[in-house]
């Protein structure tokens, strides 16, 4: 900022840092300390372990034992995927049922589950029973669920036991939004101000939020649900579309957490991003 005398005057900045990643909580340099924990003093190691123990819902006393320390080391950073069994990943295998020259295919179906597209191709008995024995001479193509071993078995994951959605009313919120809510709270608190104090100091149209995922939200509460629900017997909804937008996390924090009317923007990726 230039003064009337033409000299540059430094602008005071109050900067906060917050968030959550596989190493833990960003504020207070806790996540960084987890990365270099073997090089820290005993006192700083203990503070880092205690911070992670509380985050992972393992804090019992003001100190932790060696078993707790080993658990924390094994369940932070990059490690074997814990969210699902990597040796048993659901897969769909296409199959075709072919009738022989002399016999028809026979199988049981419940009335409500007979697809409309197959009714004209099936010999459906006239019965009041809920389960019908149907026959057909035509080829029937189906997808048979089976399991395969994942080619990816390790990844960076949030510390085991940490659930950002349990910290607020997060019903139907995608995982990325839950993490953004936590990150925004962590960052604001690290400045030493509360949200109410910031609102009193800064006009709502001068608060900007820039946040988002390059790929948008992809879990079952967002684009994942929008794209897969119709294929697995569930109902997709317009809510999945709105919650999947890349900028949605930033917009949500801006509108519902801060009550701001300032600028928002998402972080959109491209091939060159890598």
Language model features with spans:
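Short conserved active-site loop signatures built around small residues
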Residues: 274
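Short, structured patches in soluble enzyme cores that scaffold and shape functional sites
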Residues: 213, 269-271
């Amino acid at each position: 900022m230039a003064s009337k005398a033409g000299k540059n005057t430094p602008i005071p900045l109050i900067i906060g840092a917050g968030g959550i990643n596989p190493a833990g909580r960003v504020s207070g340099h806790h996540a960084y300390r987890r990365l270099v924990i073997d090089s820290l003093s005993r006192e700083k190691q203990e503070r880092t372990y205690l911070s992670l123990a509380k985050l992972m819902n393992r804090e019992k006393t003001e100190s932790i034992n060696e078993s707790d320390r080993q658990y924390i080391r094994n369940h932070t950073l990059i490690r074997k995927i814990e969210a699902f069994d990597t040796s048993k990943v659901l897969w769909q295998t296409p199959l075709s049922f072919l009738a022989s020259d002399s016999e028809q295919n026979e199988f049981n179906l419940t009335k409500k589950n007979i697809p409309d597209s197959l009714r004209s191709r099936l010999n459906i008995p006239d019965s009041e029973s809920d389960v019908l024995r149907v026959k057909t001479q035509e080829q029937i193509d189906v997808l048979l669920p089976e399991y395969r071993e994942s080619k990816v078995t390790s990844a960076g994951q949030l510390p085991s036991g940490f659930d950002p959605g349990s910290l607020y009313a997060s019903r139907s919120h995608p995982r990325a939004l839950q993490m953004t809510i936590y990150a925004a709270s962590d960052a604001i608190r690290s400045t030493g101000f509360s949200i109410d104090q910031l609102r009193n100091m800064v006009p709502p149209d001068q608060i900007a939020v820039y946040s988002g995922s390059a790929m948008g939200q992809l879990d079952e509460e967002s684009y994942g649900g929008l794209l897969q629900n119709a294929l697995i017997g569930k109902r997709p909804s317009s809510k999945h579309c709105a919650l999947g937008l890349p900028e949605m996390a930033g917009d949500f924090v801006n509108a519902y957490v801060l009550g701001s009317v300032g600028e928002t923007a998402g972080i959109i990726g491209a091939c060159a991003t890598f």
